[in-house]
């Protein structure tokens, strides 16, 4: 067999779609060379046309959203498919799909990238289901999902992941999430990254992006397809239902709302459409595009209320006296929800850090792209939480590529300001963090500058698992040994608890001696 160099393999894979046995001849490659091309990208797809796998999302007590996308040539600019393909779906109460409870057919249209979003209703609360799709004479892998319970719930366990730069590591964290005994997964944003190739896959990168920076709908579709080329990500989607929000890299770094003129608005619309096409996201039919509605509130029986926030679509520029990170409509919605919130645990899925973060005593805010760039609105919202009497608030956050635990106060500069909740910021799945030297030097400085900061650890990668009962909310920081290893083992670094009816968190005594660059003495 004639061996191709890496550049030729990447070019062929990008032009035709890696690891799909329908494309090697059109790209001038044999099947063996096609597999080599896929390996050069670090991609490994399911059999066509269901190369990108299956997923479920937004579980409710009688309904769940099922997703797939037909992509026989996942990295091609266009799919060689009919304009509309009929896709059959089935839902059953057993993995063999024999005890069928629902079935139907949905159109996969080229207009939406041949994606399928099926809201299945009439299901039983708190029940596990299995599902699959069939199209073009082929059947997808079988996915597993579950509905939310109704009424009394004794416990819930869920995972949270964020920031998964493809070139920075393999998705061992998602491999572990797929194997976790959790009810659902929350993704907190930066699902993809928009920049082009890092070039040559240097020592600190295990694989590379395909092509240049994403600008068009075709670009964003290919980037999503590349990320789903990691088998572990597809396994995590197939294993559990997901709730999702986004941050900035799904479009472009640090963007705000529609700021940037007509070219940016067009780019954002393309990015949002590709995101919707590739996610198990439930939206209200014709209103889904060009602006999918991300923010929502969902109940897990009488135990937990999950509020998913959108901190990108409606924000103004940062550092304005009247600036907004939520937008007027979403802020009013959030306040109304706070006012009528049930007596339960309240979890906000929040893509960027809510708590104040100064780099050193007397220093400025480290990053004003997060809530620190919207001081008046943050104080307004958290003061409303306090005034409403809302208790048992936990905010789960991504973006920082490091783990933080913070007390939440309406006024972070006033140590007498009441604690109204706890924020857990999770490690990234793969996205690069600061160096160990930086963390060692700056961890104590951040601790001294932020009296509300209880914990900081920035040398590891992974995800969080949250375990909730009527009496306690526990956050387990799950970390991988090596992001360069696709099957890296996972361990629990430390655990923090929040007791019901009490403000603030505390570290579990059994893990209090675990490595960290800052922890406040308790």
Predicted features and spans:
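Metal-dependent phosphoester/phosphodiester hydrolase catalytic core
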Residues: 2-522
